[in-house]
């Protein structure tokens, strides 16, 4: 149902239910949680990619389960039905989106830091037509990523947003040829994994934390988050710059 592969510091987590368009059932949600628990705990892991098998990212929660009464066991205080969507990891996750990322699948894509979409990608709140609410972060993350007006356009109409429009909105961060989303996401993940990770994670954590703070609190949090990177990485990085690394836009040596 869920497969995990590793390539050095880059992990790839694949939802593998192509016969269900990678809809997530409770067992798959548990496997996604376990996969990202392992990714978070592995000190050698730097970036994860989340994708789906068979040309579809994820069609959402498995409505066959909901129709059989699975929703009656829903606990709003527990993990999200789609898996890790109520967590904030300390490391970045990139979504590689082929085909549909809709309903809960949209919420999984929104949970990721970045979304690399193929030209075939389709995003949407398709659960609108079935009376199924967004309960895996969709109403929270979507406005933060695309703005309130565009988020409400998607939430109220349930319409499809194709790759070009998603890119223009900032819902997709990269758009590549059909079938190339995973390859492009792996290339991007390798670039991110090559940077000094203490500094990268501190800046990322500050970017997420600032939503909960006033401006003064956010600036102080950013300043405090810079202490460890300055002690452990910045001096060495400044030395490499002084010695000529990175001049002319070349960053092979990090």
Predicted regions, residues:
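Crotonase-fold acyl-CoA enzyme core
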Residues: 84-198
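Hydrophobic alpha-helical membrane-association signature
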Residues: 28-31, 181, 222
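Hydrophobic/aromatic residues within transmembrane alpha-helices
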Residues: 13, 50, 62, 108-110, ...
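Conserved hydrophobic/aromatic "anchor" residues
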Residues: 36, 57, 123, 241, ...
């Amino acid at each position: 149902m869920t497969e995990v592969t590793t390539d050095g510091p880059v992990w790839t987590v694949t939802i593998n239910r192509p016969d269900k368009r990678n809809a997530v059932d409770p067992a798959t949600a548990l496997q996604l949680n376990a996969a990202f628990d392992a990714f978070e705990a592995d000190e050698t892991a730097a970036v994860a990619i989340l994708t789906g098998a068979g040309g579809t990212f994820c069609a959402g929660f498995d409505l066959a389960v909901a129709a059989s009464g699975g929703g009656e066991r829903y606990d709003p205080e527990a993990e999200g039905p789609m898996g890790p969507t109520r967590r904030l990891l300390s490391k970045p996750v990139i979504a590689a989106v082929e085909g549909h990322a809709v309903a809960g699948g949209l919420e999984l894509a929104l949970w990721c830091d970045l979304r690399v979409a193929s030209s075939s990608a389709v995003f949407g709140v398709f659960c609108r037509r079935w009376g199924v609410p967004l309960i895996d972060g969709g109403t929270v993350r979507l406005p933060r990523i695309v703005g309130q007006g565009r988020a409400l356009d998607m939430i109220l109409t349930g319409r499809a947003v194709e790759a070009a429009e998603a890119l223009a909105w900032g819902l997709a961060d990269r758009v590549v040829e059909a079938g190339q989303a995973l390859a492009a996401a792996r290339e991007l993940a390798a670039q991110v994994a090559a940077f000094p990770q203490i500094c990268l994670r501190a800046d990322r954590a500050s970017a997420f934390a600032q939503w909960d703070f006033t401006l003064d609190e956010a600036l102080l949090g950013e300043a405090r988050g810079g202490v460890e990177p300055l002690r452990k990485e910045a001096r060495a990085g400044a030395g490499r710059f002084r010695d000529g690394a990175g001049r002319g836009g070349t960053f092979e040596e990090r």
